[in-house]
Amino acid sequence: MKQNKINNITKKQKTILIILFTFRFINSKQIQQLLNHKDHRRINSWLKDLAEKEYIERDFQPVFGTLTKPAIYFLSVKGRDFIRKTYFVDDLYLARLREDRKRSKAFRIRCQIVVDCFLLLFPNQVTEYINVINTWLDQGFKLNKPKQIQFVTPAFYEDLDCTLTSLLKPDAYGYLKNTKGITHIFFLILDAYIPKMMLRTKIQHIFTTLEEESWENDEIRSLQFYIVCPNNVLIIYLKRMLPTLLESFSSNIEVGFNLATRNQLYKRRQNPTDKTGWINLPSTEY
């Protein structure tokens, strides 16, 4: 950690800035879950104070006659400056955050779905994740937990020993190492109105990259792609398209595609013990 004396915000508020740096756009309820804090009023008080002190910006447009949705937050110029002066972070990633005020609604929603993927798919890691991020920022990035999927956002991609993250640019990444080898996991969040032609191009780019780039080594056991779709229409489209691509793909390493809708993912909110119900399409079956 760099030396940066800032005394006008609390330790919890500094943690909130780290969360925003990690996930970019995140709503107040998600922040509350990541902080593992029971009092939402306290969370809102910290956020209000940070906004008034211009460390963060608030994206909130109330619609008359509808239920109030939680406000969305992202780092301001002052917040980014705090991160830059306090931690050793990737300057290129931090530079991209300068344009966050101009980001589309679809991009902001995608960032929040990434948060939900972590909260819903890895509930046993939520309470310790803030400490994990703090360690990465203070002591340097390191994936050192065997037999456990470690969840990584684009904030830390430059530190990863995985060339595919920079080539495929997934919305989030997971790393699993056990006695059988390494599994690289890529999370892709599809926008609500993505054209089918654009989706086809996106999927074909994955296969082109895997065929043309040098990424295989003896340690890698498999590549797994988890695609969160906005509806069943795209699930059906992918189920028709992927088998043909998997049949023509040649590799000693298993490549799997796992499909689910947002609604399937969010069912775990009501019953965390329920399985998401991913549709699995592994290359070993083609």
What are these regions (language model features)?
Residues 87-99, 141, 151, 156, ...:
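Inter-domain helical "communication" segments and dimerization helices
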Residues 17, 217-286:
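Non-catalytic C-terminal interaction segments of nucleic acid-processing enzymes
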Residues 83-135:
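Amphipathic alpha-helical dimerization/coiled-coil segments
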Residues 123-127, 176-180, 210-220, 246:
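Alpha-helix termini
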Residues 169-170, 190-244:
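Catalytic cores of nucleic-acid endonucleases
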Residues 118-119, 127-182, 194-201:
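Active-site metal-binding core of divalent-cation-utilizing nuclease and nuclease-like domains
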Residues 1-102:
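Nuclease-adjacent, charged terminal/linker segments that flank catalytic cores
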Residues 30, 116-123, 205, 209:
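Amphipathic alpha-helical segments that form well-ordered structural scaffolds
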